From Swiss-Prot:
Gene Ontology BP annotations: cell differentiation
Chief localization: nucleus
Keywords tagged on the record: Cytoplasm, Differentiation, Leucine-rich repeat, Nucleus, Repeat
Subunit structure and binding partners: Interacts with NPM1 and NCL.
Protein name: Leucine-rich repeat-containing protein 34
Keyword Cytoplasm: yes
Cited PANTHER family: LEUCINE-RICH REPEAT-CONTAINING PROTEIN 34
GO cellular component: cytoplasm; nucleolus
Pfam families: LRR_6 (PF13516)
InterPro entries the record matches: Leu-rich_rpt (IPR001611), LRR-containing_regulator (IPR052201), LRR_dom_sf (IPR032675)
Species classification: Eukaryota, Metazoa, Chordata, Craniata, Vertebrata
Function: Highly expressed in stem cells where it may be involved in regulation of pluripotency. In embryonic stem cells (ESCs), important for normal expression of the pluripotency regulators POU5F1/OCT4 and KLF4. Also important for expression of the ectodermal marker gene NES and the endodermal marker gene GATA4. Promotes stem cell proliferation in vitro.
């Protein structure tokens, strides 16, 4: 098999184009990896936000030649070109790559200036694709038009397991379309529909996703950040969770849920035995909401493993109640509380949990320290999805403590 760097150099000279030193360097390293492990699948990683490469970004022309070099190589299992400038033209070549390269199971195109036209090309390519397991389109403004085409694609595609369309400017129509399609699709295990462009206060998107969750018995991971969800919306989701036995990771962060919504959530946690990760970050559940959760976690629930209540206007009383529930509930291993109002009792309670070994330092986002014989808590870089937007390209790339949600509930080929 011809080396990737040689193939790329030949294509550049054949098409009278200059070789990109960044691509050439990465392909050289990949060739070395392939020589060491010829039977393993390799991911081509050319992230445009890598601090090691001085912010160089590849263009659609670069991606055209790169994709041609990758087409016939059996060792290529994934392509990650996040934070580059491939645009709609590059999306055309990505679609061609999906048609020509049968070994790719992971494709990351997040934040690449791909619009509705590029989204259409990729969605149509996936209608016939039978190998891709995980696609990230995060941050590409495919809008409602592109969203509708991806929803239509899911009616035909039976191999894609995880789809991330967060920050894609989806409209209400496409969110409803996904909800409808997912009542029938038996392959999708994880979906991200974060930050759609919604108008009105009727929470229609949440109502439809709630109906879908009642009928879908495959979905494991659901992200619904920034849906403008209020207590009525969380009530609809909770009604669905009473009869859902597959969902393990629910992300409803950055919404408008208050203490009243926690009544419904605490109630469903009494009977639901599958939900393992719950992200309530950046809502407003306050002390009362935290107490509802702590009571359920103390007396009933023994399935939840990770809870994030970051920035929820919770004060000492509610935070201490949650810490006390961990003394009784030995299944709950991860808790994230930064951004709330810590008093001395809170600092002492979480310090005791950490020092006793009940709460491992890597499983929380706070760390105790002492000044003048008083205990305080500082923030540490742990969380459910700290590396959702940015993953380090130096040192240890995958740190479970920074992406604990995905570590506890792994879905898709690459995370």
């Amino acid at each position: 098999m011809e080396k990737l760097q040689d193939q790329y150099s030949f294509l550049c000279s054949e098409n009278i184009r200059k070789t990109n030193p960044l691509i050439l360097n990465i392909l050289q390293k990949l060739d070395e990896e392939i020589e060491k492990r010829p039977k393993e699948k390799i991911t081509v990683n050319i992230a445009g936000n890598s601090r090691l490469d001085s912010g160089q970004r590849i263009t659609s022309e670069d991606f055209w030649l790169l994709s041609k070099a990758l087409r016939n190589h059996p060792c290529i299992g994934g392509v990650d070109v996040r934070y580059n400038l491939i645009g709609d033209v590059g999306a055309y070549y990505a679609a061609k790559l999906l048609q020509k390269q049968p070994n790719i199971t992971y494709l990351n195109l997040m934040f690449n200036d791909i619009g509705p036209e590029g989204g259409e090309l990729i969605a149509k390519a996936l209608q016939k694709n039978k190998t891709l397991k995980y696609l990230r389109m995060t941050g590409n403004k495919i809008e409602n038009t592109g969203g509708m085409l991806f929803a239509a694609m899911l009616q035909m595609n039976s191999s894609l397991e995880k789809l991330d369309l967060g920050d894609c400017d989806l409209g209400l129509q496409s969110v409803i379309a996904f909800s409808t399609v997912l009542t029938q699709n038996k392959a999708i295990k994880g979906i991200n529909l974060n930050r759609p462009i919604l108008y009105g206060e009727q929470e229609e998107s949440t109502v439809h996703i709630g109906h879908m969750s009642k009928q879908n018995h495959v979905l494991v991971e659901l992200h619904m950040c920034k849906h403008g969800m209020k207590n009525y919306g969380i009530q609809q989701l909770c009604n669905a969770l009473h009869s859902n036995s597959t969902l393990r990771y629910l992300d409803v962060s950055c919404n408008k849920i208050t203490r009243d919504g926690m009544v419904f959530l605490a109630d469903v946690l009494k009977s639901n035995s599958t939900l393992e990760v719950l992200d309530l970050s950046f809502n407003r559940i306050e002390n009362a909401g935290a107490k509802y959760l702590s009571e359920t976690l103390t007396s009933h629930n023994r399935s939840l493993k990770a809870l994030s209540v970051v920035s929820n206007k919770i004060e000492g009383e509610g935070l201490v109640a949650l810490s006390q529930s961990m003394n009784t509930n030995l299944v709950l291993s991860n808790i994230y509380i930064w951004g709330n109002k810590f008093d001395e009792d809170t600092c002492v309670a979480y310090s005791n949990l950490i020092e006793s070994g009940r709460l491992k330092p890597e499983n929380t986002d706070v760390e105790p320290y002492v000044v003048d014989e008083h205990i305080y808590l500082s923030e540490v870089s742990n969380g459910l999805k700290r590396h959702y937007y940015w993953t380090p390209t130096y040192g240890e790339c995958y740190v479970p403590s920074s992406s604990a949600g995905f570590a506890l509930v792994p879905v898709g080929e690459r995370l």
